Amino acid sequence: MKRLVLPLALVALAIPGIANAELPKDVQAAIAKMGHVNDPKTAPLFAPFHTAGIPSEIKVTRDLAFGSDPAQKLDVFTSGQGTGKPILIYVHGGGFTRGDKHRPGEFMYDNVAVWAVQHGMVGALTNYRLAPAAKYPSANDDVSAGVKYIRDHAREFGGDPNKIFVWGHSAGASLVAIMVSHPNFVKATGGTLAGAIITSGQYEFKAPHPYAGDDAAKVAEVNAVEGLKKTDIPLYFTRAEWDMPSQMQQGDMIDKTLTAAGKEHGFHLMAGHNHMSQVYSIDTGETQLAEPMLAFIQKYSANVKAASAK
C-alpha cells in the first residue's frame, strides 16, 4: 500500500463560530439530516463563517481572459508581496453543465483563493465552457489553457511556474482527473503539475454522458483510471461521508484501485461533510480538509526545483 501520510497538526485559523478545527455540532446535524444528496441548503449553513469577505490586503484581479470565449476567464488572488510562491488553481463543479468560479454577493469560491493567499500561495479560480453546448474535450482544453495562462504569467503574480497545483471538485475533479491521466492535456499547460487535488469526482464514465458524449467507445477513452495509475503527478483524493452515492463509490473505487496497483496517492474521507461542504469549509477554521491539503502542497512544493527568476 502506498497511501501518503500527511501531518495533520498545522495552524488552525481563529474564525468565530468554528472552534477546535471542527464543524459545529448543529452544522454536522443539519448535514446528516440532508443525507446523501447535493442539497442547496448547504451553502447557507456556511455563509455565517464567511462574512469577513476578502481581506483588504489581498489583491483580486477578475476575469482575466485566456481565450476568446466568454467562459474562458479566470480570477487571480495575490498578496502583492513575495516571489516564487506555490500556485493553487481551483476548478469548480456543476455537473459539467453549470457552475461558475465566482458568485457575486456569495462566498464561493473566493474562499478557496483567499485561503491560498493566507497560506503563502497565489490563488486562482478558473471557468471553462459548459455542456451540452461544449462537449469533450472543450472543458479540458480550457482547464489546460487556464493553467498555461497562469504558468506564463506566474512571476507577475509572485508565483513559481514550476509549483502549480490544480484542485477540482465534483465535475471539476473529473476534469482534473482526466487532465492528469491524459498526457496531452498536461503537455498543453506548457509544463507539468506539482500536484493534483481531486475532491468527489467521477473517474469512470458511461454513455450517455453530458460531457463525454453518447458514443460508448469515445466515452471509454475519456475514463481516467488507467491514466491515474501511470501519471507521475502527485495525487490527493477526498470524498465526503455524506457524499452522493456515485461519488462515494467512485472515491472508494479509485483509492482501492490505486492502492492495489501500488500507486502512491493520498486519500481522505471527510467525516461529517457532504458533497459541497468540503469546499465551503475552506477558510472557516474547520481544517479537516485544509490541513492535509496544505501539507500536500508544502510537501510537493519542497520537492520541486524552483524556476529561475527570469
Task: Give, region by region, the residue ranges found by the protein language model.
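The feature captures the conserved acid-bearing segment of alpha/beta-hydrolase catalytic domains
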Residues: T189-G195, S200-A260
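Short beta-strand element of the alpha/beta-hydrolase
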Residues: G84-G95
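Short amphipathic alpha-helix adjacent to the substrate-entry channel of hydrolases
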Residues: H102-A124
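Primarily recognizes the serine-hydrolase "nucleophile elbow" in alpha/beta-hydrolase
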Residues: A145-G213, V219
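N-terminal cap/lid segment of alpha/beta-hydrolase-fold proteins
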Residues: D26-T83
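Serine-hydrolase catalytic-loop signature spanning alpha/beta hydrolases and amidase-signature enzymes
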Residues: G95-R98, R103, G123, Y149
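The conserved beta1-alpha1 loop
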Residues: V91-G93, I150, R239
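C-terminal catalytic histidine-bearing segment of alpha/beta-hydrolase fold enzymes
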Residues: T238, P245-M248, D252-D255, T259-K310
